[in-house]
Curated annotation (Swiss-Prot):
It is an enzyme of class 1 (oxidoreductase). Belongs to the TmoD/XamoD family. Pathway: Aromatic compound metabolism; phenol degradation. It comes from Pseudomonas sp. (strain CF600). This is Phenol 2-monooxygenase, stimulatory component DmpM.
Length: 90
């Protein structure tokens, strides 16, 4: 089984701020730009932090907001008000 986790977003203005935050918080992540889609993958774990997204957006942000732009995910999800984590728990 692959140990890569991934998340793919529609390529739009809202998602670009989230992608930027993911890259800031996960320097090991690989970003792939496709037509109308941005896919981010990483070995074993990706963390999306509310605080980083809020800094990029310049406003308050609820983690649930990003789900409107999510196309697909791969990995086990651990989510609370401050973060959204994808990882494989073996």
């Amino acid at each position: 089984m692959s140990s890569l986790v991934y998340i793919a977003f529609q390529d739009n203005d809202n998602a670009r701020y989230v992608v930027e935050a993911i890259i800031q918080d996960n320097p090991h992540a690989v970003v792939q730009h496709h037509p109308a889609m941005i896919r981010i993958e990483a070995e074993k774990r990706l963390e999306i932090r509310r605080e980083t997204v809020e800094e990029n957006l310049g406003r308050a942000w609820d983690v649930q907001e990003m789900l409107v732009d999510v196309i697909t995910i791969g990995g086990n999800v651990d989510e609370d008000d401050d973060r959204f984590v994808l990882e494989w728990k073996n």
